[in-house]
């Protein structure tokens, strides 16, 4: 079938995107977007207006719950540190080290799980519903296998922390805290694959409600274990692990019993054991892409500890990074939404819809990020007092706010384009771009400006902004030059390989 020249059936634009009375998940292409964009009798402005009305409705329905999910997931780690801080300063340091160490496996599992977005999203758009369950099982197996060496690594966290120069007391307490978090590794393996399985079908709100309920449960149980059962900071670790497994169990139960998924989840299958290596290669590219992005800002904070006034530099940069991370969650929500939209439309053979979804999400996220950046500049002299009462730190934060504003704007574009890459299956290519822009250009230039030319924190941040800007411009150019008809054909070939029971490979 020639999908690039296929005539898409016109639908009534008054038809709602999702029929409230329908209990079965329906594919997104049958909503009129492609027919609007290809309707020659309508003027260009009219097509854009009607297409935007359709797309924005879908986009925000996906992005808002996704933003809530990522905020809640971050909130679980933050609440654990808050309780640890009330137990004692050493406990806070141990919990902070433990959570920071677990960001490694969190980013790894989140990145590998994003491969499910590519395959499930395209299979769903192409009406290959039975393959979604196969992809879900295969991804869970691969991530669980990757979790085994990570478990071994965290089991020996004490000597590793000592080797990294941490104090013995903090290293010992941190290693005990990490031991209580180890079961989370396998919770991540199931959670992120199940979450992407749901997102590929535009089912996002249930995960948001489950995550919010788990956060409330975590806060309640942590209070009980710390103040009633007197379990100390180890009780905080145990409750955090239990809370993640509550999320996993709730999502799996929802998938198993909901009639929405009777076509996409048909039970366990031996087919999930086929092609594990090929899936690992695709998911490894996703993991590298996301991990390199997550670690980039952390390196900025680490380098600040080497400056002339490390305490003030660390405090000011940590405050700026906290604000940046909060705004970044909005972009990550749009990242998830555009990944679903792009993969769905490519799988359905709708090149114009995939193109329109890409640029609509990019524009909306850019506008939001500019608004956030302007707010940061406007309140630059006051925002730091949310975190500290130190006037010197507040002054340093105010001086860094222009750099923070630029970072926020770039972070409003770059994650969305990364979401497009996931939807199209470009993870490995973007990983190479990230390595070059971040670690070959951004960090070395930042070190030269910060240490050699003595621009201190501003110099380091300038170099890293340069790396992010270069990466963003490359992704913008690649996305602009994309032949969406060819991407549709690639998606079709990737899915057609399953008819021969072969593994769909990344193009």
Swiss-Prot record:
InterPro entries: MATE_euk (IPR045069), MATE_fam (IPR002528)
Primary location group: membrane
Keyword Ion transport: no
UniProtKB keywords: Membrane, Transmembrane, Transmembrane helix, Transport
The keyword Transmembrane belongs to this UniProt entry's keyword annotation: yes
Cellular localisation: Membrane
TM region positions: 58-78, 92-112, 141-161, 178-198, 209-229, 233-253, 287-307, 318-338, 359-379, 403-423, 433-453, 459-479
GO biological process, alphabetically ordered: xenobiotic detoxification by transmembrane export across the plasma membrane
Any Gene Ontology CC annotation: membrane
Its membrane topology: Multi-pass membrane protein
Molecular function terms, GO-annotated: antiporter activity; xenobiotic transmembrane transporter activity
Pfam families, alphabetized: MatE
Family: Belongs to the multi antimicrobial extrusion (MATE) (TC 2.A.66.1) family.
This protein's name: Protein DETOXIFICATION 39
């Amino acid at each position: 079938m020639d999908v690039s020249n296929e005539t898409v059936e016109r639908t009534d634009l008054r038809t709602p995107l999702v029929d409230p009375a329908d209990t079965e998940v329906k594919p997104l292409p049958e909503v009129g977007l492609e027919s609007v964009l290809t309707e020659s009798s309508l003027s260009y402005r009219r097509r854009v207006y009607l297409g935007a009305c359709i797309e924005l409705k879908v986009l925000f329905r996906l992005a808002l719950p996704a933003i809530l999910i990522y905020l809640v997931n971050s909130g679980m780690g933050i609440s654990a540190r808050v309780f640890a801080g009330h137990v004692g300063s050493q406990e806070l340091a141990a919990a902070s080290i433990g959570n920071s160490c677990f960001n490694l496996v969190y980013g790894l599992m989140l990145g590998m799980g994003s491969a499910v977005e590519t395959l499930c999203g395209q299979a769903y758009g192409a009406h290959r519903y039975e393959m979604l369950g196969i992809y879900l099982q295969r991804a869970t197996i691969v991530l669980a296998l990757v979790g085994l060496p990570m478990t071994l690594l965290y089991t020996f966290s004490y000597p590793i922390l000592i080797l990294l120069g941490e104090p013995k007391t903090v290293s010992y307490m941190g290693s005990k805290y990490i031991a209580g978090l180890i079961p989370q590794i396998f919770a991540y393996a199931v959670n992120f694959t199940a979450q992407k399985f749901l997102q590929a079908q535009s089912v996002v709100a249930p995960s948001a409600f489950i995550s919010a309920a788990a956060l409330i449960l975590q806060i309640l149980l942590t209070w009980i274990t710390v103040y009633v059962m007197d379990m100390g900071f180890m009780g905080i670790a145990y409750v955090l692990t239990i809370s993640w497994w509550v999320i996993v169990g709730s999502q799996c139960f929802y998938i198993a019993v909901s009639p929405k998924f009777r076509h996409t989840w048909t039970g366990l299958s031996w087919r999930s054991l086929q092609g594990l290596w090929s899936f690992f290669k695709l998911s490894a590219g996703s993991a590298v892409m996301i991990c390199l992005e997550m670690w980039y800002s952390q390196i900025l904070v680490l380098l600040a500890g080497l400056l002339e006034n490390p305490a003030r530099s660390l405090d000011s940069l940590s405050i700026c990074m906290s604000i940046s991370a909060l705004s970044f969650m909005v972009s990550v929500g749009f990242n998830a939404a555009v990944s679903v939209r792009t993969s769905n439309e490519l799988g359905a053979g709708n090149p114009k819809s995939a193109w329109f979804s890409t640029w609509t999400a990019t524009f909306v996220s850019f506008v939001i990020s500019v608004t956030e950046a302007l707010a940061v500049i406007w309140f630059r002299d006051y925002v730091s007092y949310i975190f500290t009462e130190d006037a010197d730190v507040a002054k340093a934060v105010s001086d860094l706010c222009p750099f923070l504003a630029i970072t926020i704007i770039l972070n409003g574009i770059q994650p969305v384009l990364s979401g497009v890459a996931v939807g199209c299956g470009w993870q490995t290519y973007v990983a190479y771009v990230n390595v070059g822009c971040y670690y070959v250009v951004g960090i070395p230039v930042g070190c030269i400006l910060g240490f050699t030319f003595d621009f201190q924190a501003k110099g380091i941040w300038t170099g890293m902004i340069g790396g992010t800007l270069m990466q963003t411009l490359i992704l913008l150019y690649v996305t602009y030059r994309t032949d969406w008809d060819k991407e549709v054909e690639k998606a079709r070939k990737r899915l057609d390989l399953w008819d021969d029971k072969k593994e769909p490979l990344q193009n």
